[in-house]
Curated annotation (Swiss-Prot):
Expressed in all cells of embryo. In L1 larva, it is predominantly expressed in Z2 and Z3 primordial germ cells. In adults, it is predominantly expressed in the germline. Residues 316-327, 456-465, 869-908, 958-971, 990-1007 have a biased composition (Low complexity). This is Histone-lysine N-methyltransferase set-2. It comes from Caenorhabditis elegans. Keywords: Chromatin regulator, Developmental protein, Methyltransferase, Nucleus, RNA-binding, S-adenosyl-L-methionine, Transcription, Transcription regulation, Transferase. It is an enzyme of class 2 (transferase).
Length: 1507
């Protein structure tokens, strides 16, 4: 993009390259050029600004230009838009730009582009990966920590898919890049959960995915963010691989620059090595799994007088090649072959044997083309760094059988080697260390052909690996471990080797970055000039080393040497070689080497440094070709003379000599062409010059040590089928080796598992059989016990049935005997049991046609008082003779059976006392007389109830009634002061005490005669009008007093009572034996359900009398009634309903007296009128309140003028309405006195308008409550809803007033009935809890079986399971202590588990924050239960019934902490016996604090405070 006015506003540094004017970018070329940074108008609401976006706008017409110009953009001469930043100040002065606002484009929001297969921009760095983090960090905690930095879209913590353990890795994705960077900066400097983690900005989660694959053996991240999950997996894999390669390139470039800076300090130092030579020296070199690897040749000798060199740097892989004196010369691989006429055969390798196919299926086709080896220098620190990572150890054992063949023409050499390989590999994979040992047997066949090849082109020496090796996926690339040491100069080095050419670091970088389409290791060489030729030889070890191709790790670049003049690279820098300057001096440049003999060591070129060191001198590009220099005392290398090389004219033609002087190292720039592959003869001729046609001397080599790889120097391509496991660090181990190691380890593991499986299986099987047999035996034993118990229960049941039958027979016999005995009981005893309450029901408002005994008026209660008092204090009546019954009575009185029973009791007691002093004959006569008197009295009692009874019988009864009444009256006066409550309680007496006197007949007669009128009224067909108790009694008493009763007819004293047709036969038995007698004698008694005594378990009234009452049983059919006779019936009581019913009132059943039937006329059916139930409650009719008296009207005397003026003058606030009326009157009077408005001070007529004060809002009598039950609306005005009527205007304006304990207790919610010590539960609640217990019957059965099988029931594990499946019956209700409480619905024994305290387990720090928050909200912290020092259970919002347990200073429960499966739980145990309905409490054990909390438990030992 063309710009102008560069001096006016200099561009920013970030756009300096784009803003530079270029002469080539002119004319129409700019118009057609698609510039990345063009300016485009962007419209927003209220703003218009420019930004860089898309292609430049091409103004093709004037209208377009005018449209753009209106927005303030100028046009250049090339018809392009101008950068508005160049002349922004001038634009501000222009009228066009005054209405527009410009903003810098860097402040614009970056668009979130979708990542897909077409994504090619900078990756969005919104993902942050975390490594080495605390394993306690969860996704929730990580998200909480990340929220402090910005919006979190996704947070994930890596969990191992197999072990389900925390992998200490996670990632967080933010909404923006800035937020991700803030998070990275924050936790790069501080800890995350007390652990220093390693955050990384990780686009596409590339680094995290790679580490996850290493840890999980190739599995990818299971959970990704939404945008990454929507990408195709192959596309995402490529994006991750590109990002990782870019990161590796940046790291390599930084390390190379650091290395160059360090190496430049020692550059330029050149020292002469003519006076020095080396001793015998073994180089410990690294070997790696590379197809370019060849072993180095032995080092040249050094003069003895020279000081010994320092020891080489320790390398981890020296143990396998230590006995061989081989030193790698790093410059031999850079020697270029020269043109020569020397005929050297070039050997072509054969195909590898089939045993090699398991390592690499592509190796056999690529060895001939990929046999070039590169070498690179290493610093001592480099070797030290890699020595600790991994190592590979290998030993080769060569057998005695060696074969060599040659054909007739002498052009083919066949060499066979049989060897045994033993390698030991140690390397690190992730955080794991692997160590494996391999033993292999290999066979190599070498064939060669005598021919010469000229180096004509670059393509002949090496070919691309596209044809031989396929593309490798990024997963295989990512398995290569990145370096961890920052002092490595090249992290992608693979092995040492010799090559005829050199490769630059740029080539290595490009190979590492995978910019080529095939993503494989291509080798392209460039022909070198004739002045820079090198030679290449192979030692015996080089011939025995195969060429392994590792497609995982790219080969390292060769050491940087002297670049050629005609080469141009993107980075004009040289990688220096470092060497100590004190030991290696340069030899003379043109010194001729001495002849080589068998006794002398080979040549050595001292112009080259020894292996393992780098030179500190600058490269000499124009140095002449040096003459080979011979060094003495060098041990003979293990070289074998090959007949095919006999064309060499001189002895040194077949033995490698020293290299020439330092030659420039060639660097490859384009790698577009590949040189031809030179032959061995050409390389020899390029090194030593033209060969002569002399036969070389046969060299016989003797070694003091066994040769392991003594082979010919014909060609390195003849070793294609040899396999050598080379050693390197953990990052240069090939994928093949890793696969082999993993397979070998898996195989070994499977073998160990197979060996250990059999005994383990046997042990497990034996243990299972023993356990199974034990269980089966236990089950059989339990089954036998159950069968035995069942049989025993059946026998016991049969025995119980037999005993019951025996007891039944005995009872029948006893009842039969009792029935035969004469009975001397009265029917009144039966009547006392049938009171009104025995027929009553709580759910009914009526009684079964039976009205209760009226509670007599005080003035008519004397006889009742006497009757009740005579029970507690028996009086021995003086009238106990037989003639006392005929004494006359002055008047009739109303008496009851209970009053007559008292007299009978006294009479019977006196008779018993007189019996004790008499003879047996007298006693027998008295018994007969008493029996006849009893029969006579009973007959009189029943005959008096009948209307048809004779007058004689009535007179007899009347006389006896008078006698008993007089005696009752005399005794009543003596006991009139007795307690009324005891009289009520002693009203009911037994039949024995009430059956020996004749007063009962009198009471029955009087009661019966008083009820004749109601009976007559009922026969008229109209229902009797119910009366009150007082009216009924007063009416009856008046009738009795006013009427004159005829004397009754005397009653016979002999004969059975059951013979009378008007009597209902009966017998007196004990109430407990009534059911038995009814079963035994069904024909002579009524059934049990017809009398239903009140003392059974279903009744709610206890027996006040300690003596067991007896009841009277009527006979159903005492005699056959004659046809036409009236049946015997029991009539209801003759009294009407009463208001107050006594607790114990006897019900007397009497014969039904029917009037003679009269013919009645048929009447029209009337509407049925239901009587009102006298026992129902009726609301009283509403009464109108009387009208209030009229208010007294206040009158005030009129004020004087002075008082009015004073009021007006003293008015500071708004005057009230009365004062305003006075002001109005004063204004009107003033204005009326003037003729015109001009005479007024204010020059116009005014109208007074009153100002009303705002009245106080009306308060509601009953404030409206909110949904939570709190008062919300206090005023009638709806606008004042929520306003509290406080005089100060705000509740915060009121001072704090501490409430007393009494005030606090008045505010605590209490149950409705605090007097009840225990809670009362409904039947519905108990039924629901009982059904829940029945539903868990199967679980309890399983629990018992488990306890029985294990035998140990004291373990906490079983206790907690018992708690789970056998919960106690508990319920929460209002507590008298505070709020809600937990109550027991069943009796609980001591030390039994009641309930578990369930809640949310939180840490102590979180508990403190929640406690503060709860206190601010008024909830309180009473639901926080501390387990230990670090954990607290919070049941405030999540819990069960246990959180309702209140505190008590004298609790009946205690809390215990149990550990179940590593998790601590709190269980509530019972301390004492807890009865049904008692509240469950335990001691909160709050720590002692200054701010006291009052305790409301109310226990005897209450401390007063919880804390």
């Amino acid at each position: 993009m063309s710009t102008h006015d560069m001096n006016h506003h200099p561009p920013r540094k970030s756009h300096s390259k784009r803003d530079k004017p270029s002469s080539s970018n002119s004319g129409p070329k700019i118009e057609n050029h698609k510039c990345k940074w063009a300016w485009q108008k962007v419209f927003e609401t209220g703003k218009s600004f420019l930004r860089r976006d898309g292609f430049p706008q091409d103004c093709k017409s004037k209208e377009d230009f005018e449209r753009i110009k209106r927005t303030g953009v100028r046009k250049t001469s090339e018809n392009m838009l101008e950068d508005p930043r160049k002349n922004f100040e001038s634009l501000q002065q222009s009228s066009v730009y005054q209405t527009n606002s410009f903003r810098n484009p860097r402040y614009l929001c970056r668009a979130h582009l979708r990542v897909d297969s077409y994504y090619c921009t900078i990756p969005p760095k919104r993902e942050v990966s975390l490594f080495n983090m605390d394993d306690n960090c969860t996704e929730v905690l990580l998200r909480d920590f990340a929220k402090d930095c910005g919006k979190v879209e996704k947070a994930y913590v890596c969990i191992h898919p197999e072990t389900k353990r925390h992998m200490k890795m996670a990632y967080v994705k933010f909404a923006t890049v800035k937020e991700a960077h803030n998070f990275y900066s924050m936790y790069h400097a501080q800890n995350l959960l007390a652990t220093k983690c390693t955050p990384r900005i990780d686009p596409f989660l590339s680094i995290l995915n790679e580490e996850y694959e290493v840890a999980t053996n190739g599995q990818v991240l299971p959970i990704l963010p939404d945008d990454l999950a929507s990408i195709d997996p192959s596309v995402l894999r490529d994006l991750r691989a590109n990002f990782l390669r870019d990161q590796n390139e940046k790291y390599e470039l930084a390390m190379r620059n650091t290395y160059e800076d360090e190496g430049g300090m020692l550059s330029g130092v050149i020292m002469d090595t003519s006076d020095h030579y080396e001793r015998d020296y073994t180089m410990d070199h690294d070997v790696g799994p590379s197809s370019m690897k060849m072993s180095p040749i032995p080092p040249p000798p050094i003069k003895e007088e020279s000081p010994p060199p320092p020891p080489p740097p320790p390398v981890a892989s020296v143990s396998n090649l230590a006995p061989v004196p081989s030193v790698q010369l790093p410059y031999y691989n850079n020697i270029q072959p020269s043109s020569s006429t020397m005929h050297m055969p070039e050997f072509r390798p054969t195909e590898p044997p089939p045993s090699y196919s398991r390592e690499d299926p592509y190796r056999s086709t690529s060895r001939s083309s990929l046999s070039r080896h590169r070498n690179r220098s290493r610093s001592p620190s480099d070797g030290m760094d890699r020595s600790g990572r991994s190592s590979s150890r290998r030993t080769h054992r060569r057998p005695e059988s060696r074969n060599g063949s040659k054909n007739a023409n002498g052009d083919v050499v066949k060499y066979e080697t049989y060897k045994m390989e033993k390698r030991k590999i140690k390397y690190e994979g992730g955080n794991k260390k692997y160590e494996q040992v391999h033993i292999k047997e290999r066979t190599a066949v070498i064939r060669g052909k005598n021919q010469l090849e000229n180096v004509s082109s670059e393509s002949a020496s090496g070919s691309s690996s596209v044809d031989t090796y396929p593309d490798f996926s990024d997963e295989e690339r990512k398995k290569k471990k990145r370096p961890k040491s920052p002092n490595r100069s090249k992290k992608d080095s693979r092995a040492f080797g010799w090559d005829s050419t050199d490769e630059s670091d740029e080539d290595t970088r490009r190979r590492r970055s995978g910019r080529s389409q095939n993503r494989s290791s291509e080798r392209k060489f460039q022909t070198t000039s004739s002045s820079s030729t090198r030679r290449e030889l192979s030692s015996t070890h080089t011939n025995s080393v195969p060429n392994l191709k590792s497609h995982e790790t790219p080969p390292p670049p060769p050491p940087k040497g002297h670049p050629s003049v005609h080469l141009q690279t993107p980075y004009q820098h040289v990688q220096p070689q470092m060497i100590p300057a004190t030991y290696y001096n340069l030899p003379p440049q043109h010194m001729a080497p001495p002849p080589i003999t068998t006794s002398l060591p080979p040549f050595c070129d001292f112009s080259q440094p020894p292996p393992g060191f780098t030179p500190t001198f600058k490269p000499i590009t124009n140095a002449p070709l040096p003459t080979p220099y011979q060094a003495s005392n060098i041990p003979q290398p293990g070289l074998v003379q090959i007949a095919a090389l006999s064309a060499a004219p001189e002895p040194f033609s077949s033995i490698p000599g020293p290299p020439p002087g330092p030659a420039p190292i060639q660097e490859d720039v384009g790698r577009a062409e590949s040189p031809e592959k030179p032959s061995l003869s050409e390389r020899f001729s390029g090194i030593f010059g033209p060969t002569q046609r002399e036969e070389p001397a046969q060299v016989e080599v003797e070694y003091d040590y066994p040769l392991k790889h003594s082979e010919s120097h014909d060609d390195r391509h003849s070793l294609e089928d040899m396999d050598v496991e080379v050693s390197s660090d953990g990052e240069t181990v090939s994928n093949v080796e890793k696969i082999e190691c993993m397979e070998e380890k898996k195989r070994q593991d499977l073998e160990r598992i197979a060996i250990a499986r059999t005994p383990i299986v046997k042990k497990c099987k034996k243990r299972m059989m023993d356990e199974l047999s034990r269980k089966v035996a236990e089950d059989i034993r339990q089954q036998i016990m159950r069968q035995c118990f069942a049989a025993l229960d059946e026998k016991l049941h049969l025995k119980a049935i037999a005993d019951e039958e025996k007891r039944k027979k005995e009872r029948e016999e006893k009842a039969r005997q009792e029935a035969e005995k004469p009975s001397n009981h009265l029917i009144a005893d039966m009547m006392t049991l049938y009171n009104n309450q025995s027929f009553a029901s709580s759910s009914r408002g009526f009684y079964r046609k039976q009205k209760p005994i009226p509670k007599s008026h005080p003035k008519h209660q004397e006889h009742h008082h006497h009757a009740k008092a005579s029970v507690s204090t028996p009086v021995h009546s003086s009238s106990t003779s037989r003639n006392s019954s005929v004494a006359p009575t002055p008047q009739r009185t109303v008496s009851t059976s209970s009053s007559s029973s008292s007299a009978a009791t006294s009479a019977r007691v006196s008779e018993d006392e007189s019996d004790s002093d008499s003879t047996p004959g007298e006693v027998q006569r008295r018994k007969t007389s008493v029996l006849s008197n009893d029969k006579r009295r009973r007959r009189a009692s029943f005959s008096s109830t009948s209307i048809q009874s004779s007058p004689e019988r009535q007179r007899d009864v009347s006389s006896s009634s008078r006698t008993s009444s007089s005696s009752s009256t005399s005794s009543m006066k003596q006991e009139e002061t007795a307690d009324e409550k005891s009289r009520k309680r002693k009203l009911i007496m037994s039949s024995d005490e009430s059956s020996t006197t004749g007063s009962t007949a009198t009471s029955v007669v009087s009661s019966r005669q008083s009820s004749l009128e109601p009976q007559q009224e009922k026969t008229d067909g109209e229902p009797p009008k119910k009366k009150s108790q007082t009216d009924f009694i007063s009416e009856r008493v008046s009738k009795i007093e006013g009427e004159e009763r005829p004397l009754p007819e005397p009653v016979e004293t002999s004969g059975p009572i059951i013979g009378d047709s008007s009597y209902l036969p009966y017998k007196i038995v004990h109430w407990e034996k009534a059911g038995i007698i009814e079963m035994n004698l069904p024909a002579n008694s009524i059934r049990a359900h017809e009398y239903h005594p009140f003392t059974t378990e279903h009744c709610y009234f206890g027996i006040d009398d300690p003596r067991q009452p007896k009841i009277q049983i009527f006979d159903h059919s005492p005699c056959k009634s004659e046809p036409g006779s009236e049946p015997l019936k029991i009539t209801p009581a003759p009294w009407g309903p009463i208001d107050n019913v006594a607790e114990t009132g006897p019900l007397i059943y009497m014969d039904v007296v029917t009037a003679p039937k009269t013919v009645q006329k048929k009447q029209k059916p009337r509407k049925q009128v239901f009587e009102k139930d006298p026992y129902e409650y009726y609301e009283p009719p509403p009464t109108k309140r009387p009208a209030p008296p009229p208010r007294f009207k206040k009158t005030f005397k009129p004020r004087s003028e002075e008082e009015k003026k004073k009021i007006i003058g003293d008015c500071e606030d708004l005057p009230d309405l009365e004062d305003q009326w006075y002001l109005r009157a004063a204004l009107n009077e003033m204005q009326s006195e003037v003729k015109s408005a001009d005479e007024l001070p204010w020059k116009k007529m005014l109208t007074f308008k009153e100002m009303l004060r705002s009245e106080d809002p009306l308060l509601r009598l009953n404030p409206i409550r909110s949904k939570k039950g709190l008062p919300d609306a206090f005023y009638e005005d709806e606008e004042l809803d929520g306003v509290i009527p406080v005089a100060a205007g705000c509740s915060r304006a009121r001072p704090y007033e501490k409430m007393t304990m009494k005030q606090k207790r008045s505010l605590v919610r209490r149950p409705d009935n605090e007097s009840h010590p225990t809670a009362i539960f409904s039947e519905r609640d108990e039924t629901a809890i009982r059904h829940q217990h029945l539903a868990s019957k199967d679980m309890r059965l399983l629990q018992r079986r488990l306890l029985t099988s294990l035998g140990d029931a004291n373990n906490d594990f079983f206790k907690i399971n018992q708690l789970k499946f056998r919960k106690k019956m508990i319920k929460f209700a209002r507590s008298r202590i505070h709020g809600w409480g937990l109550y027991a619905m069943e009796s609980i024994a001591p030390d039994e588990m009641i309930v578990e305290y369930i809640g949310q387990t939180i840490r102590s720090l979180v508990a403190e924050e929640r406690e503060k928050a709860y206190e601010r909200r008024g909830i309180g912290s009473s639901y926080l239960f501390r387990i230990d020092l670090h954990h607290v259970i919070d049941a405030t919002k999540r819990g069960n019934f246990a959180r309702f347990i209140n505190h008590s200073c004298q609790p009946n429960c205690y809390a215990k902490v149990l550990t179940i499966e590593g998790e601590k739980r709190i269980v509530i145990y019972s301390r004492t016996i807890i009865k049904k309905g008692e509240e469950i409490t335990y001691d909160y054990k709050f720590p002692i604090e200054d701010d006291k909390i009052d305790c409301l438990c109310g226990a005897k030992t209450c401390r007063g405070y919880l804390n």
